A protein has these predicted regions:
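Conserved catalytic palm subdomain of right-hand nucleotidyl-transferase polymerases, strongest
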Residues: 1-2
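Short linear motifs embedded in intrinsically disordered, charge-biased segments
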Residues: 6-11, 16, 22-45, 49-339
C-alpha cells in the first residue's frame, strides 16, 4: 500500500486489524481450539478482496512490461489476462515468457504467495520452438487447449472445443434433473423455466464470442430438441416436427438466440469508452500475415455479414447503440420463437 501512495494512518489501521488475528472452525456442532492466522487475508472481511487484488496487481506490475507482451494498440502491449488469481501471461517468444514467469514467481514469493506448478500450463501457437518453460527445475506441462474462466481456448482458435464442452456440461446438468422432467406434479411451463435457467444458461455461457458454423448450430439444436422432447414426454414412435416443438415450448432457434446474445453484448461494448479493453478487443487487428488461399471465416467477419444483413456497418452500429431503446428494439427483433 505504501507503493500505491496510501497514507500511513490507513496502513497502520489495517495492520492493527490483522495483528494477532486467528480463528476457530465449527465441526459437527463443536468449535475447535483457537489458532493463529499468520498468512493470507481475513476470511469474511469486506476489505480482504481489495487487499488481495492489490497484492496481485503489485506482483503483475513488477512482472510484466519491458515489451514482453503482444501488440495490443499502436502504443501499448497486452501482457496478461487476469481475474482474481486466475492469470494468463502472454508473450511473442519463449525467452520473453520464461523471463515473465521467473519474475512472477519471484514477486509472488515476496508477498507470501506461490505459483501452483501443477495447475500452471503452457500453450504455444504458430511456433516451432520446442524449448520448455520452467519454474525452478520443473518443466511446465504443454497443452493444446485450456479452460480460462469457463471457456475453452485452443491453439488453433475457433469455437468447436468450447461448444463441445458446453454441451457436455449442459447434458450432465439435464441428466441430474431427471426427476424434475419425469414429475407429473410439475407443470410443463415450470419445467421449461427450470430448463432455461439451469440448463440453457450453462449451454450458452460465453456464446457471445462463438463463431457458429452450420455444423455447430446443428449439434446445439439437436441437443436442445432432445431435451424439449424429454420435457414434453414425447418418445418414439410418437413424432413432432421441430417447428411444432419450438412453438409448443416457446423456444427460439438456437442460432437466433445466440445472435441475440451476441448483439446484446455488442451494444454494451460499443457504448463503452474508447479506452475500454472490451472495445479494444472488438476492434483489434492482430499482428502477422494470414496464409495463402481463402480467408478463414472468423467471428468478426461473421458479425460484419450479420450487420450487413441489417444494413449496418460497425460504425453505424456504434452510433445506433448509443440509443439504448433503439438498440434494444433491434436485438428484440433478432429472436423469434416461430421463425
Amino acid at each position: 500500500m505504501e507503493d500505491y501512495g496510501q497514507p500511513d494512518k490507513l496502513i497502520n489501521l489495517i495492520k492493527s486489524m490483522y495483528k494477532d488475528s486467528g480463528g476457530q472452525i465449527l465441526h459437527k456442532g463443536k468449535l475447535t481450539d483457537f489458532f493463529a492466522i499468520v498468512t493470507g487475508v481475513r476470511q469474511g472481511c469486506l476489505i480482504s478482496p481489495f487487499l488481495f487484488l492489490l497484492a496481485i496487481d503489485w506482483i503483475l506490475t513488477r512482472s510484466t512490461g519491458d515489451n514482453t507482451g503482444i501488440q495490443w494498440t499502436l502504443n501499448s502491449q497486452l501482457d496478461d489476462l487476469d481475474y482474481a488469481d486466475d492469470l494468463a501471461l502472454l508473450s511473442h517468444t519463449r525467452a520473453q515468457m520464461q523471463t515473465k514467469t521467473d519474475k512472477l514467481c519471484e514477486n509472488s514469493a515476496m508477498v507470501g504467495l506461490q505459483v501452483n506448478i501443477a495447475k500452471t500450463k503452457v500453450m504455444k501457437s504458430n511456433t516451432t520452438s520446442t524449448e520448455p518453460i520452467q519454474i525452478g527445475n520443473t518443466q511446465l506441462e504443454e497443452v493444446g487447449k485450456f479452460v480460462y474462466l469457463g471457456s475453452t481456448v485452443t491453439q488453433t482458435g475457433g469455437t468447436d472445443e468450447d461448444v463441445k464442452a458446453r454441451i457436455y456440461k449442459a447434458r450432465h446438468t439435464f441428466a441430474n434433473l431427471h426427476k424434475v422432467w419425469s414429475s407429473k406434479n410439475i407443470r410443463v411451463n415450470t419445467k421449461l423455466k427450470i430448463f432455461n435457467s439451469n440448463v440453457k444458461s450453462i449451454l450458452l455461457y460465453g456464446s457471445e464470442t462463438w463463431f457458429l458454423t452450420k455444423k455447430l448450430e446443428s449439434k446445439l439444436q439437436t441437443f436442445i430438441n432432445k431435451c424439449l422432447r424429454r420435457i414434453l414426454n414425447i418418445f418414439w414412435p410418437e413424432v413432432i416436427s421441430n417447428q411444432s416443438l419450438w412453438e409448443k415450448t416457446k423456444q427460439p432457434r438456437i442460432s437466433q438466440q445466440i445472435k441475440q446474445r451476441k448483439f446484446r453484448w455488442l451494444g454494451h461494448t460499443l457504448r463503452k469508452d474508447n479506452d475500454s479493453i472490451a472495445k479494444y478487443a472488438l476492434k483489434w487487428n492482430p499482428q502477422g500475415k494470414r496464409k495463402r488461399g481463402r480467408p478463414k471465416t472468423t467471428w468478426r467477419r461473421q458479425l460484419t455479414k450479420e450487420l450487413e444483413a441489417l444494413r449496418l456497418t460497425l460504425r453505424g452500429a456504434e452510433s445506433l447503440a448509443q440509443d439504448r431503446r433503439a438498440w434494444r428494439n433491434l436485438v428484440g427483433g433478432l429472436c423469434s420463437a416461430t421463425e
